[in-house]
A protein has these predicted regions:
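Residue-level signal for inorganic ion chemistry
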Residues: 15, 144, 294
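Core dinuclear metal-dependent hydrolase active-site scaffold
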Residues: 2-91, 95, 165-249, 350-369
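Binuclear metal-ion centers of metallo-dependent hydrolases, dominated by the metallo-beta-lactamase
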Residues: 244-369
Length: 369
């Protein structure tokens, strides 16, 4: 079957996974350089073979391609983490990508924003474009200004920072909780959800600093992270440990009140984590959101792609299609998702996977069809 593509007359949406791994990425260096006698990591070691390609997982990131009201395709990148440039070098040519019309940043962690400097490759000497529009929360903008002042004010650039010069050229846009915005004048609508009372919790942080030798007694607050709903066709939730109840009415419905076609949802590993959903939490959220298709992302190295496929097949059918004996990891994963209704479509994403949403809401992709 040939790769699905966004047809000229289509009013649908493409989504390409640039990265599906947590901040550490895969493979892990400690796994590839393990000492004799140490337990081998099947997931990381498999990346050294062609068969293990889907276990190579860069920082979570994706590209949305959707037709604007003028008929032109608009390219939106979600998050530019520590290995964004490597992901772009691999996947942009393969998918015919070049100009970036907008960048959306979910939160101010390194795996979401440390690739901002690499965007100079697009604006350097105006070879591709004179600037890139970047959409962030006020809190994220403040952190970018603190961490990379030359990206916000070019007088901080050591080389001078001429327009179309040696530093990236950005136009910054501050976006707000539950306030839909348009990507320039394209007609493309994005709804961010974060902030109080609506918030995606991505771990926790403390309200004050503790002395190094003492435990903090300060109040613990959720660390808030943006999710995005784009054109009522895609919900993106890459870094989340909890979805509050008042978020669900936003993310459960697509066009005309139908289920949203595609949900991209965090799943670090089998067990729960302070900053990320574990498998049981992810599947429970997927069942509640009720998207036509849910793609899991943000994986560590504890579970291989093949094992996630087996587990999610069980979620959908109540049985697996695998003809081989189940691994211990698969058995544990299936045990964790027992008790809920079957019939939902969930699969692990992988770097380079392309998902196509037709204007009618039907969904196909390049791996599962």
């Amino acid at each position: 079957m040939s790769s699905p593509t966004l047809k000229q007359a289509d009013d649908g949406l493409d989504f390409i996974f640039l990265g599906t791994g947590t901040s550490s990425s895969l493979p892990h260096i400690e796994c590839l350089t393990a000492l004799p006698g140490e337990k081998p990591c099947r997931t990381c070691l498999s990346t050294l073979t062609p068969e293990g390609k889907k276990n190579t997982r860069r920082n979570t990131s994706g590209v949305v391609r959707v037709r604007g009201k003028d008929g032109n395709i608009v390219t939106i990148v979600i998050d530019v983490g520590k290995n964004f440039q490597a992901a772009a070098l691999e996947w942009f040519p393969k998918h015919g990508l070049r100009k970036i019309d907008a960048v959306l940043i979910t939160h101010a962690h390194a795996d979401a924003m440390n690739g901002l400097d690499d965007l100079r490759g697009w604006t350097l000497n105006c070879h591709i474009q004179p600037h890139i529009d970047v959409y962030v929360s006020e809190a994220t903008f403040t952190e970018i200004h603190r961490s990379f002042p030359y990206l916000v004010m070019k007088e901080f650039a050591s080389g001078g920072g001429d327009v179309c010069g040696d530093v990236p050229e950005f136009k910054w846009h501050i976006i707000h909780d539950k306030v839909p915005f348009e990507i320039q004048e394209t007609g493309i609508s994005v709804t961010p959800f974060s902030g109080k009372p609506l918030a995606l919790h991505h771990g926790r942080h403390f309200s004050s600093k503790a002395e190094p030798s003492k435990a903090s007694s300060s109040k613990i607050h959720p660390y808030l992270c943006f999710g995005f709903k784009i054109q009522d066709a895609l919900v993106y939730l890459s870094d989340v440990s909890h979805i509050p109840e008042d978020v669900y009415p936003i993310i459960q419905k697509g066009k005309g009140g139908a289920p949203v076609p595609v949900c991209v949802l965090d799943c670090l590993r089998l067990q729960a984590h302070t900053s990320h959903m574990g498998l049981a939490e992810s599947i429970a959220a997927a069942r509640k959101i009720g998207a036509s298709r849910t793609y899991l992302t943000g994986f560590g190295h504890e579970v291989s792609h093949e094992e996630y496929v087996t587990i999610t097949e069980y979620v959908g059918m109540g049985e697996t299609a695998s003809k081989r004996p189940l691994s211990d990891v698969e058995k544990e994963g299936i045990q964790l998702v027992q008790g809920g209704p079957h019939g939902i479509w969930v699969r692990p994403a992988h770097d380079g996977l392309k998902v196509v949403v037709a204007g009618t809401g039907s969904v196909v992709d390049t791996s599962y069809f």
